[in-house]
């Protein structure tokens, strides 16, 4: 009330013509603000569904909402002059400092707090000022369930608004991601593969799962545990039955601090994305004659359980980012076939490219995680029947590498494709025409109006020019040439496509070049628009 009395005094002086018209305006403005300020209150809100949106699996006890899985979050709009959120720590604050939970607080999508939780309570200031404003707030667990969660205890706000706190709107699409360390973003911020795990370098906001959900404008829920598998956790070949996801899928969390069964009825998903099998590899591959069938059967059982809990969901299965695709993926394919559910599909993930860097303990780098988010969003679009924009996707990633030679013109050659999809071509006799020997990456789908970047690295022992063509059955979309040298050279060119093509190919024409060795690597055709 003191502010109002002072303002009224100033206004009285103005009415006696003691102050100028400009000062009279300023005094009125002060009076209005003073009245509003006196109507504002310091309020405290609990993080319950009436006030906030809770994303992902969570646990509630003593009015605290614990976010307990990678990416689990509390989101709300706050309208007021100032606001804080109070974060609680649980038993995990006593973990070794490398294994304490990490969380982030975002205001209008900007990270304002990134903290390893090491105390029982911590207050984060969201904003402070004299002018009322509305912001969107998110409190998210950045580390994984293995290392505990953090609790949102209360939201404190000074506000004059009738609705100071309200939930962020739900998205139209909801995706559940089930996985292991790859899904959790294990080591994604580590400088290299030689650094060991710690939660300070694990960041779910850089995981393919988070980025794919963001690209698809979807809500998400995560169930992922590092080192876990379908029938065995990570091992040197002996069975590790204590680290399997199917045994804990129906629980809120494996962590005993957050007991109870998950409420599937009120948390149905439109899509379930499963990325498991990497940690099973060492166990399964040691005795494939018997263990392949064991894996297939347990995967069938897991799909059956997921379908029971999510009757209408589309389910997409994959494995392979950290290897194991050749050994484990066929088993997943077989399990999907045995279940016979038309809403379940699968694909083999491309193994990470070492040239894109590595995170802790040889885990995917930020580049690899980002690229896989484009792949995952594209696969989800295909599964649910909506058009994918394919932006960010390397449409040549699954292309078939092969060569053609015109033996009638005397052309001869050999080729080899490396595990990293490097392409080695050695000509004997080059033939008579430039088209007599062609190295091809085929089976590429192109979209009309799409803008793509064609990239690759090349080298040869001879200096010459090699034609490079992007063509379909009846149309050449692009034509250029590269000058070869003994030094590895990077090529990059932007291409706009004028019409759809479901079976295009990248072609390198090596005809007429006798005894010519040509090496290609990192061939990519990435859609950028």
Each predicted region: which residue ranges?
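Alpha-helical cap/lid subdomain in secreted, periplasmic
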Residues: 108, 246-385
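Conserved SGNH/GDSL esterase-like catalytic core that processes O-acyl groups on lipids
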Residues: 69-71, 188, 194-288, 323-329, ...
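Extended, low-complexity, turn-rich repeat/linker tracts enriched in Gly/Pro/Ser/Thr and Asp/Glu
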Residues: 86-101, 145-146, 324, 447, ...
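Positively charged n-region of N-terminal signal peptides that target proteins for export
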Residues: 1-4
């Amino acid at each position: 009330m003191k502010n109002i009395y002072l303002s009224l005094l100033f206004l009285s002086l103005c009415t006696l013509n003691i102050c100028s018209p400009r000062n009279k305006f300023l005094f009125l403005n002060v009076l209005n603000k003073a009245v509003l300020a006196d109507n504002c209150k310091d309020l405290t809100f609990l993080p319950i569904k009436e006030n906030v949106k809770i994303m992902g699996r969570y646990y509630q006890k003593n009015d605290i909402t614990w976010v307990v899985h990678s990416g689990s979050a509390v989101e709300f709009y706050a309208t007021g002059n100032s606001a804080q959120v109070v974060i609680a720590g649980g038993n995990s604050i006593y973990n070794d400092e490398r294994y304490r939970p990490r969380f982030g607080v975002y205001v209008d999508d900007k990270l304002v707090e990134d903290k390893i939780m090491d105390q029982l309570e911590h207050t984060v200031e969201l904003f402070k000022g004299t002018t009322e404003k509305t912001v969107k707030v998110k409190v998210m667990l950045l580390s994984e369930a293995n290392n505990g969660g953090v609790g949102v205890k209360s939201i404190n706000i000074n506000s004059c608004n009738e609705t100071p706190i309200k939930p962020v709107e739900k998205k139209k699409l909801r995706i559940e991601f089930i996985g292991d360390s790859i899904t959790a973003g294990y080591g994604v911020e580590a400088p290299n593969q030689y650094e060991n795990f710690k939660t300070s370098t694990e960041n779910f906001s850089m995981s393919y799962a988070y980025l794919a959900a963001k690209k698809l404008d979807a809500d998400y829920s995560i169930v992922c545990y590092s080192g876990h598998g379908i029938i065995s956790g990570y091992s040197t070949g002996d069975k590790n039955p204590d680290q399997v996801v199917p045994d804990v899928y129906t629980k809120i969390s494996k962590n005993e601090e957050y007991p109870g069964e998950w409420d599937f009825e009120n948390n149905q998903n439109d899509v379930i994305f499963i990325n498991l099998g990497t940690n099973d590899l060492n166990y399964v591959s040691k005795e494939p004659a018997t263990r392949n069938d064991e894996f297939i059967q347990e995967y069938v059982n897991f799909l059956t359980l997921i379908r029971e809990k999510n009757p209408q969901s589309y389910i997409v299965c994959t494995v392979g980012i950290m290897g194991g695709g050749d050994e484990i993926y066929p088993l997943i394919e077989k399990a999907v076939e045995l279940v016979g559910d038309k809403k379940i599909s699968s694909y083999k993930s491309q193994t990470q490219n070492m040239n894109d860097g590595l995170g802790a303990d040889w885990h995917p780098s930020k580049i690899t995680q980002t690229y896989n988010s484009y792949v995952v969003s594209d696969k989800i679009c295909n599964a649910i029947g909506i058009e994918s924009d394919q932006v960010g996707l390397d449409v040549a990633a699954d292309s078939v590498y092969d060569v053609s030679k015109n033996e009638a013109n005397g052309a001869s050659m050999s080729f080899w494709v490396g595990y990293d999809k490097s392409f080695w071509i050695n000509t004997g006799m080059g033939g008579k025409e430039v088209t007599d020997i062609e190295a091809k990456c085929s089976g590429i789908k192109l979209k009309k109006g799409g803008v793509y970047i064609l990239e690759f690295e090349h080298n040869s022992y001879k200096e010459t020019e090699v034609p490079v063509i992007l063509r379909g059955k009846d149309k050449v979309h692009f034509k250029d040439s590269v000058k070869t040298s003994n030094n590895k050279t990077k090529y990059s060119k932007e291409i706009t496509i004028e019409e759809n093509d479901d079976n295009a190919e990248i072609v390198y024409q090596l005809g007429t070049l006798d005894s010519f060795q040509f090496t290609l690597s990192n061939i990519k055709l990435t859609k950028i628009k």
